[in-house]
Protein backbone atom coordinates (compact mmCIF):
# COMPACT_ATOMS: atom_id res chain seq x y z
CA UNK A 1 0.00 0.00 0.00
CA UNK A 2 2.78 2.44 0.92
CA UNK A 3 4.45 1.83 -2.46
CA UNK A 4 1.22 2.76 -4.28
CA UNK A 5 0.82 5.94 -2.23
CA UNK A 6 4.42 6.89 -2.97
CA UNK A 7 3.95 6.07 -6.65
CA UNK A 8 0.77 8.17 -6.81
CA UNK A 9 2.48 11.09 -5.02
CA UNK A 10 5.49 10.91 -7.35
CA UNK A 11 3.22 10.79 -10.39
CA UNK A 12 1.23 13.77 -9.19
CA UNK A 13 4.43 15.70 -8.45
CA UNK A 14 5.74 14.79 -11.93
CA UNK A 15 2.61 16.20 -13.57
CA UNK A 16 2.55 19.40 -11.48
CA UNK A 17 6.30 20.09 -11.69
CA UNK A 18 6.48 19.33 -15.42
CA UNK A 19 3.51 21.61 -16.13
CA UNK A 20 5.06 24.41 -14.07
CA UNK A 21 8.48 23.86 -15.68
CA UNK A 22 7.11 24.02 -19.21
CA UNK A 23 5.17 27.19 -18.40
CA UNK A 24 8.26 28.77 -16.80
CA UNK A 25 10.61 27.83 -19.66
CA UNK A 26 8.18 29.08 -22.32
CA UNK A 27 7.75 32.33 -20.36
CA UNK A 28 11.51 32.88 -20.13
CA UNK A 29 12.08 32.18 -23.82
CA UNK A 30 9.32 34.66 -24.69
CA UNK A 31 10.40 37.39 -22.24
CA UNK A 32 14.18 37.16 -22.49
CA UNK A 33 14.87 35.13 -25.63
CA UNK A 34 16.88 32.70 -23.47
CA UNK A 35 16.81 30.97 -20.11
CA UNK A 36 17.98 32.74 -16.97
CA UNK A 37 20.01 30.79 -14.41
CA UNK A 38 16.78 29.82 -12.64
CA UNK A 39 15.20 28.72 -15.91
CA UNK A 40 18.29 26.64 -16.65
CA UNK A 41 18.06 24.92 -13.26
CA UNK A 42 14.34 24.26 -13.71
CA UNK A 43 14.93 22.95 -17.25
CA UNK A 44 17.43 20.39 -15.95
CA UNK A 45 15.44 19.56 -12.81
CA UNK A 46 12.32 18.91 -14.89
CA UNK A 47 13.62 15.43 -15.75
CA UNK A 48 14.27 14.38 -12.13
CA UNK A 49 10.63 13.63 -11.20
CA UNK A 50 10.36 11.33 -14.22
CA UNK A 51 13.53 9.50 -13.19
CA UNK A 52 12.19 9.13 -9.63
CA UNK A 53 8.81 7.98 -10.94
CA UNK A 54 10.57 5.46 -13.18
CA UNK A 55 12.56 4.11 -10.25
CA UNK A 56 9.37 3.66 -8.25
CA UNK A 57 7.61 2.00 -11.18
CA UNK A 58 10.33 -0.61 -11.61
CA UNK A 59 10.55 -1.08 -7.85
CA UNK A 60 13.83 0.72 -7.25
CA UNK A 61 16.40 -1.30 -9.22
CA UNK A 62 18.96 -2.07 -6.51
CA UNK A 63 20.14 -5.28 -8.16
CA UNK A 64 19.93 -6.75 -11.61
CA UNK A 65 17.19 -9.27 -12.23
CA UNK A 66 18.34 -12.76 -13.23
CA UNK A 67 20.24 -12.69 -16.50
CA UNK A 68 18.10 -13.52 -19.49
CA UNK A 69 17.89 -12.50 -23.11
CA UNK A 70 15.49 -9.69 -22.15
CA UNK A 71 17.78 -8.44 -19.38
CA UNK A 72 20.70 -8.41 -21.81
CA UNK A 73 18.69 -6.47 -24.39
CA UNK A 74 17.57 -4.02 -21.71
CA UNK A 75 21.11 -3.40 -20.48
CA UNK A 76 22.33 -2.97 -24.06
CA UNK A 77 19.57 -0.42 -24.75
CA UNK A 78 20.38 1.52 -21.56
CA UNK A 79 24.06 1.77 -22.57
CA UNK A 80 23.17 2.63 -26.18
CA UNK A 81 20.64 5.24 -25.06
CA UNK A 82 23.07 7.02 -22.75
CA UNK A 83 25.75 6.89 -25.44
CA UNK A 84 23.42 8.50 -27.99
CA UNK A 85 22.36 11.16 -25.48
CA UNK A 86 25.92 12.08 -24.54
CA UNK A 87 27.10 12.02 -28.16
CA UNK A 88 24.24 14.31 -29.21
CA UNK A 89 24.89 16.72 -26.34
CA UNK A 90 28.56 16.86 -27.35
CA UNK A 91 27.61 18.83 -30.48
CA UNK A 92 26.62 21.77 -28.30
CA UNK A 93 30.09 21.95 -26.66
CA UNK A 94 28.86 24.01 -23.68
CA UNK A 95 26.12 23.68 -21.09
CA UNK A 96 24.95 27.20 -21.94
CA UNK A 97 24.46 26.25 -25.58
CA UNK A 98 22.71 23.01 -24.61
CA UNK A 99 20.14 25.09 -22.69
CA UNK A 100 19.63 27.46 -25.62
CA UNK A 101 21.36 30.48 -24.08
CA UNK A 102 24.27 30.59 -26.53
CA UNK A 103 22.96 30.62 -30.10
CA UNK A 104 25.81 31.20 -32.58
CA UNK A 105 24.21 28.95 -35.20
CA UNK A 106 21.79 26.13 -35.75
CA UNK A 107 23.23 22.69 -34.97
CA UNK A 108 22.48 20.48 -37.99
CA UNK A 109 25.43 18.07 -38.13
CA UNK A 110 26.11 14.68 -36.59
CA UNK A 111 23.01 13.03 -35.15
CA UNK A 112 21.11 16.28 -35.75
CA UNK A 113 21.02 15.34 -39.45
CA UNK A 114 18.65 12.48 -38.55
CA UNK A 115 16.65 13.90 -35.62
CA UNK A 116 15.99 17.40 -34.33
CA UNK A 117 16.06 15.94 -30.80
CA UNK A 118 18.56 13.05 -30.73
CA UNK A 119 19.24 13.59 -27.02
CA UNK A 120 15.56 12.88 -26.29
CA UNK A 121 15.68 9.82 -28.56
CA UNK A 122 18.75 8.52 -26.70
CA UNK A 123 17.21 9.14 -23.31
CA UNK A 124 14.03 7.41 -24.49
CA UNK A 125 16.05 4.38 -25.62
CA UNK A 126 17.65 4.33 -22.17
CA UNK A 127 14.20 4.22 -20.55
CA UNK A 128 13.01 1.47 -22.89
CA UNK A 129 16.05 -0.54 -21.76
CA UNK A 130 15.30 0.23 -18.12
CA UNK A 131 11.71 -0.85 -18.52
CA UNK A 132 12.66 -4.07 -20.35
CA UNK A 133 15.23 -4.94 -17.69
CA UNK A 134 12.89 -4.30 -14.75
CA UNK A 135 9.55 -4.97 -16.46
CA UNK A 136 6.29 -4.41 -14.62
CA UNK A 137 2.90 -3.59 -16.14
CA UNK A 138 3.33 -0.02 -14.82
CA UNK A 139 6.32 0.59 -17.07
CA UNK A 140 3.89 1.54 -19.84
CA UNK A 141 2.86 4.51 -17.66
CA UNK A 142 6.48 5.55 -17.23
CA UNK A 143 7.12 5.42 -20.96
CA UNK A 144 3.94 7.34 -21.76
CA UNK A 145 4.95 9.97 -19.18
CA UNK A 146 8.35 10.29 -20.86
CA UNK A 147 6.83 10.60 -24.34
CA UNK A 148 4.40 13.29 -23.13
CA UNK A 149 7.19 15.21 -21.39
CA UNK A 150 9.63 15.25 -24.31
CA UNK A 151 6.90 16.05 -26.81
CA UNK A 152 5.87 19.06 -24.71
CA UNK A 153 9.48 20.17 -24.16
CA UNK A 154 10.25 19.83 -27.88
CA UNK A 155 7.24 22.01 -28.73
CA UNK A 156 8.38 24.74 -26.30
CA UNK A 157 11.95 24.61 -27.61
CA UNK A 158 10.77 24.70 -31.22
CA UNK A 159 8.82 27.92 -30.60
CA UNK A 160 12.03 29.48 -29.31
CA UNK A 161 14.18 28.14 -32.16
CA UNK A 162 11.72 29.49 -34.76
CA UNK A 163 12.07 32.96 -33.24
CA UNK A 164 15.87 32.75 -33.04
CA UNK A 165 16.69 31.13 -36.41
CA UNK A 166 13.59 31.94 -38.50
CA UNK A 167 13.48 30.44 -41.98
CA UNK A 168 16.69 28.44 -41.46
CA UNK A 169 15.00 26.52 -38.66
CA UNK A 170 11.78 26.04 -40.64
CA UNK A 171 13.84 24.63 -43.54
CA UNK A 172 15.61 22.32 -41.07
CA UNK A 173 12.21 21.18 -39.72
CA UNK A 174 11.11 20.34 -43.26
CA UNK A 175 14.23 18.19 -43.81
CA UNK A 176 14.67 16.46 -40.45
CA UNK A 177 12.07 14.65 -38.31
CA UNK A 178 11.36 15.83 -34.77
CA UNK A 179 12.34 12.51 -33.18
CA UNK A 180 12.75 9.47 -35.44
CA UNK A 181 12.73 8.87 -39.15
CA UNK A 182 14.80 9.36 -42.23
CA UNK A 183 15.79 12.84 -43.39
CA UNK A 184 13.76 14.09 -46.34
Where are these regions (language model features)?
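Membrane-anchoring alpha-helices and their flanking helix-loop junctions
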Residues: 1-108, 125-160, 164-184
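Short, amphipathic, aromatic/basic-enriched membrane-interface segments that mark the entry/exit
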Residues: 106-117
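Loop-to-transmembrane-helix entry motif
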Residues: 115-121, 179
Amino acid sequence: MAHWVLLFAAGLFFIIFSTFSLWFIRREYRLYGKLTWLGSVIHCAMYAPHAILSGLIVGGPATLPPMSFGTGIGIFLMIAGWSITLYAMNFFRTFSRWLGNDTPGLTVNGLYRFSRNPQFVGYGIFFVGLYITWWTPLTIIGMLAYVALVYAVARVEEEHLKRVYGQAYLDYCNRVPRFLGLPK
